[in-house]
């Protein structure tokens, strides 16, 4: 499946059109349209000023930016951009740090990755086929 264009509309004239910051990057950087402060252990919904029109075969997944997490303890609450939505994308940021986090208008706060959607029929069964992995997980293969 190839999708060459995804439409976006500016709801706020200060909104910045997202772009990938490096060749081969999967995520498009999303900017805030406002400045703000998030206290330690606080959260805030941050406006982007953009509404998206994604095709039926695609969903946009919002992820955090590794630098914000590493340096500022900022986490992004996962958000999806679904086909047919026409409202502003609002991103919730969580401050897991000990300091107030301040951001400015046009700050890159998250990244948006577009992925294809696979539609499946869900089949309720009494049991599942056994696999080699079975019920293992949660570190069962070790660290090295």
Curated annotation (Swiss-Prot):
Keywords: Hydrolase, Magnesium, Metal-binding, Nucleotide metabolism. Transmembrane segments: none annotated. PANTHER family: DEOXYURIDINE 5'-TRIPHOSPHATE NUCLEOTIDOHYDROLASE. Involved in nucleotide metabolism via production of dUMP, the immediate precursor of thymidine nucleotides, and decreases the intracellular concentration of dUTP so that uracil cannot be incorporated into DNA. GO terms for molecular function: dUTP diphosphatase activity; magnesium ion binding. CDD domains: trimeric_dUTPase. It catalyses: dUTP + H2O = dUMP + diphosphate + H(+). The gene is DUT1. One of its GO terms (biological process) is dUTP catabolic process. Pathway: Pyrimidine metabolism; dUMP biosynthesis; dUMP from dCTP (dUTP route): step 2/2. DUMP binds at residues 66, 133, 138-139. Homotrimer. NCBIfam families: dut. Belongs to the dUTPase family. Its cofactor is Mg(2+). Its EC number is 3.6.1.23. This is Deoxyuridine 5'-triphosphate nucleotidohydrolase. InterPro entries: dUTPase (IPR008181), dUTPase-like (IPR029054), dUTPase-like_sf (IPR036157), dUTPase_trimeric (IPR033704). It is an enzyme of class 3 (hydrolase).
